[in-house]
Amino acid sequence: MPTRGYDFASPKIQTVFYDNIIFTILLMQKDSGAPCTDCAVFPRGAIMKRLIGILAALCVLVGCKETKKTIKIGIVQLVEHPALDDAYKGFVDALSEAGYVDGTNISIDYENAQGEQANCVTIAQKLVNDRSDLILAIATPAAQAVANLTKDIPILVTAVTDPESAKLVKSNDVPGTNVSGTSDLTPCAAQIDLLKRLVPNAKTVGMLYCSSEQNSVFQIGLAKAQCDKLGLAYIDATVSSTNEVQQVTQSLVGKVDAIYVPTDNMVSSSIVTVAQVANENRIPTIVGEEGMVERGALATYGIDYYALGKQTAFMALDIIKNGKKPADMPIQYLEHCTLAVNRDTAAKIGISIPDDLK
C-alpha cells in the first residue's frame, strides 16, 4: 500500500499535478504584471520537462514512495515439546539472520494446537482465512490439517518424517503440490543397533508409540525391520492419548528388556512419565531425539531439530525472495546425526556405556 500523499507512479496523477503547477506559474506571472502571452515562449511540454527534476525531489518530501508489502507467515505447531520448539526457534532465527524480522518486514502468526487434532484444523482454517503468504506446519498432523484446507498458499512442513506416506506430496523428490519442507527422518535402524550395543542381552523390545501418528507408524516399521535382522522380538504398546501413556508403559514391565520410542509427538510430550516408569524398573529406553534423552530417556542417535528449522527457513527464503514453488522443491533431510546419552539415567539403571560411545 502507498503511504499518504500522491501516488506519482500513476500517469493520471502526474498529469493533474503538472497541470496544476503550470497553472500556478501562469497565475504568478500574471500577478507580477508579466503578460500571459509571454508564456508562449515556454511551450507546455518544455515546462513539464523542466519540472520533472523538481517533482522528483518533491516526491521524497511528500511521501510518495511505495512501501514494501509485509509478508504474512502463519505457523501451526502440533504440541509443545523440545524437538518441535527447537524447530520453530531455528526457523524464526534463520529468517531474522537473513533480514526478515517479525514486526518489521514480516508478520508471524504463531499458533500451538496443544496436541489436539481438532485445534490443528481450527488454526489451519484461521491461517488460510487470514490469507497468509506462507504457512509453516510443524509435525505431521499439523501439516495434514493445513494441506487439506488450501491448495494455493505455499506450505512448508518440518518435523514430518515422510511427507509422501502422509499424502502431503506426490513424491518426496518431486512434491508436485503446494507443499514441501524438511523431514525429521531419523536413523531408526541405527537406533536399534544402539539399543543392542547398550543392552547386549536384550531379547524383547517394547515399541511405544501413538498408532494414529503416521510418522510414528513409518518409523516403527523401520525399527521392526532392524529388530528382525538382529533377532530381536518386539511388542507393540500403542497409545491414543497422553492419559494412556503411564498405564501402557507400566504394562511393559516384566515383558520387555528395553523400550523404543520413535519421534512420536504424543509420547514425546509425556516422556518424563515414560522415563520415570522405565527407570524405576531398570528398563533402558532408546528414543528418537535428544530432547527425550535430556528428560530422562537413556540414549538416542538423532538429528538436531534447531538445525532442521533453520534449513526449513532457507527454503522459505527461496519462496519469498526467489519465487520458487513448493511443487518443484524436493523434501530436504539433515545429513548429520548426533549420539546423546543420559549418563545419570545410565547410572541409575545400571547400564555401562562402552568406551567408544562416551
Can you say where each PLM-predicted feature lies in the sequence?
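Short, low-complexity disordered leader/linker segments with a strong preference
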Residues: 1-8, 12-71
